[in-house]
Swiss-Prot record:
Major site of localization recorded for this protein: cytoplasm
Gene name per UniProt: htpG
Nuclease recorded as keyword: no
Annotated stretches, region: B: 341-547
Keyword list, A-Z: ATP-binding, Chaperone, Cytoplasm, Nucleotide-binding, Stress response
Segments of this protein annotated with the region A: 1-340
A Pfam family: HATPase_c_3
CDD domains: HATPase_Hsp90-like
HAMAP family given in the database record: HSP90
PROSITE patterns: HSP90
Protein name (record): Chaperone protein HtpG
Length: 621
């Protein structure tokens, strides 16, 4: 027996690798299974170039054997095994990758590839085991070897007897600690769960013993029978031919992966073989998850490296405006042990993400074009996120999303795209008009919209907080600027202008003095037809934006620049004129009342509701 030290490594390095790369101890099993799969792939590679070797895939498998009494977990494979030199080279040096070295010598010949990085992944076993024993017999040799280590202090190698080619790894599971239950890695149900989670699509069968109850022949009684059962699915759906798959196959996969309790509206199956190779199945859900619009929600797709799950939610694969998309990505070009930090700078991952965004956009555009009813169902659930995509990152993605958003049309009484709105605009209409408020019913009654509607121009109703912010970031659509119906200048040429007498001009000035600090101006309205009063705004901040900004935490004192407009054809206006001429105190009361009525119509708070109520009652007596 030879006792050796690890080459150029220390306890600190081993601990640093374990804690920095692996945050969940359960992934040790994923690493060992991946290495076992690699070992069988190596025989496959040899069979491709050596006609004397026959590769019968059915003869290759991985076996998992937990033993609670001895606290041992054994993983057996029928792979290529390791020589003594390979044991020292691959297991004696942390971060040395036998698989990567083999891969460099054997470039992919027909699609098979090597997953693991043996020197890194193997050492994850020490997260759950205090002793690791490896017994291996290399392909084409009669000699077997035993490698054993208790950790960073070193390892021993000796010759042993082993009948079959392959490798047996025995983990001596640690005793439980106060904050760590290692017993779970000896529980068959827990091991199956880990296998299904991380290694379900390894191409070789992963077998475990399972006890079944079977009827005893010639009797009503049953007996317990132990049988070997394959735990993993082996062939992932994303590697199957799309033509062989049905909608039901995709729905079943959606349910199996627990992407949601609903049925997806659409699936997207991608098989890319260009600058970067990857397969992906994406789903557009019908309904958001319960936490989708909460701060706890995490976006991301499952990320696999050649069939092995390396990240449950890779956020870098999805832009925020498509964060509702569920699904997975599997790439042969990604490393199994790539860290989150490295992923953020990975060129291949960025190419995949860019391609995925393009595919999602194309499919949503097709859904909008070909199945409007289904798209609107989707939009009711996720339209807010699409509009957020216009606003987010200073509008960097606005061109990606602008043709996917819908708004309620006042004229059509239905949702329309911006393109549909512009296409229906009369020739003399200069702007895309919109109105912001809590509901379409409330906006239908908005006093400021009377002139725009009289001209036969459509109005888009903005009923979500994000709408106006998104449109301001968009600036225009197809060269047409957006304009609120509350804007002081609607950009509408009128044959009849509101004529103001000298006395009325003086009265407006007096009203402005009464409302000093509250409004910028008081003037005659050109937009009001049946209502007595309304607010117009001047500048970028609308009244709805003011309400939203003031409701935010740590809000700044942001307010819309308000203009009080009066309908000079209304009876109320004549009452104000009379009061101005005959009763100045009443005139001031009327002025404040008009201002407060305008506040109420906009849903803004009145500074003193009690005084307002008393004032209304006083005027009734």
């Amino acid at each position: 027996m030879e006792t050796k030290q690890f080459k150029a490594e220390s306890k600190r390095l081993l601990e640093m690798m374990i804690h920095s790369i692996y945050t969940h101890k359960e992934i040790f099993l994923r690493e060992l299974i991946s290495n076992a799969s690699d070992a069988m792939d190596k025989i496959y590679y040899k069979a491709l170039t050596d006609e004397t070797i026959t590769f019968d895939k059915d003869a290759y498998k991985i076996t998992i054997e937990p033993n609670k009494e001895t606290r041992q977990l054994i993983l057996r494979d029928t792979g290529i095994g390791m020589t003594k030199d390979e044991l020292e080279e691959n297991l004696g040096t942390i971060a040395k990758s036998g698989s990567l070295a083999f891969k460099a010598e054997n470039e992919s010949k027909d699609g098979h590839d090597i997953i693991g990085q043996f020197g890194v992944g193997f050492y994850s076993a020490f997260m759950v085991a205090d002793t690791v024993t490896v017994v291996t017999k290399p392909f084409g040799s009669d000699v077997a070897y035993k490698w054993e280590s208790h950790g960073v202090d070193g390892y021993t190698i000796e010759e042993v007897e082993k009948e079959m080619v392959g490798t047996d790894i025995t983990l001596h599971i640690k005793a439980n600690e106060e904050d760590e239950n290692y017993d779970e890695y000896l529980e068959p149900y827990r091991l199956r769960s880990i296998i299904k989670k991380y290694s379900d699509f390894i191409r070789y069968p992963i077998e475990m013993e399972e006890t079944e109850q079977r009827p005893v022949e010639g009797s009503d009684e049953t007996e317990s029978v132990t049988v070997m059962k394959t735990v993993n699915s082996m062939v992932p759906i994303w590697r199957k031919n799309k033509r062989e798959l049905t909608d039901e196959d995709y729905r079943n996969f959606y349910q199996e992966k627990r992407y949601g309790f609903d049925a997806p509206i659409k699936h997207i199956h991608i098989s890319a073989d260009g600058a970067v190779r990857y397969q992906s199945i994406l789903f557009i859900p019908e309904q958001p998850s319960f936490d989708y619009y909460s701060k706890e929600f995490e976006k991301g797709l499952e990320l696999y490296a050649n069939g092995v799950l390396i990240m449950e939610k890779c956020s870098d694969l999805l832009p925020d405006h498509f964060s509702f998309v569920k699904g997975m990505v599997d790439s042969e070009d990604l490393s199994l042990n790539i860290s989150r930090e490295m992923l953020q700078h990975d060129r291949q991952l960025k190419l995949i993400a860019k391609n995925i965004q393009s595919k999602i956009k194309t499919q949503l555009e097709a859904l909008l074009r070909d199945d409007r009813e289904k798209y609107e169902t989707f939009y009711q659930a996720f339209g807010r996120q699409l509009k957020f995509g216009i606003y987010n990152d200073y509008g960097m993605q606005k061109d990606t999303v602008k043709d996917l958003v819908l708004f309620h049309s006042a004229k059509e009484k239905k949702l329309v795209t911006l393109a549909e709105y512009v296409a229906a605009m009369p020739e003399e209409q200069k702007y895309i008009y919109y109105a912001s408020g809590e509901s379409t019913d409330r906006l239908d009654k908005l006093p400021q919209s009377e002139l725009v509607k009289d001209k036969g121009f459509d109005i888009l109703y903005f009923t979500e907080e994000i709408d106006e912010f998104a449109i301001q970031m968009l600036l225009n659509y197809d060269g047409k600027e957006f304009k609120s119906v509350t804007s002081s200048d609607l950009g509408i040429e009128q044959t009849e202008q509101a004529e103001t007498t000298e006395t009325q001009a003086e009265m407006f000035k007096a009203m402005q003095e009464v409302l000093a600090g509250h409004v910028k101006e008081v003037k005659a309205s050109t937009r009001l037809k049946s209502h007595p009063v309304c607010f117009a705004t001047d500048g970028a901040v609308s009244i709805e934006m003011e309400k939203i900004l003031k409701a935010m935490p740590n809000n700044q004192d942001v307010a819309a620049v308000k203009i009080l407009e009066l309908n000079t054809s209304h009876d109320v206006f004549r009452a104000i004129e009379t009061a101005y001429a005959e009763d100045r105190p009443k005139f001031e009361r009327y002025t404040k009342l008009m201002y407060q009525q305008a506040l109420l119509m906009e849903g803004l708070p009145i500074e003193d509701p009690v005084a307002f109520a008393n004032e209304v009652c006083a005027l009734m007596i």
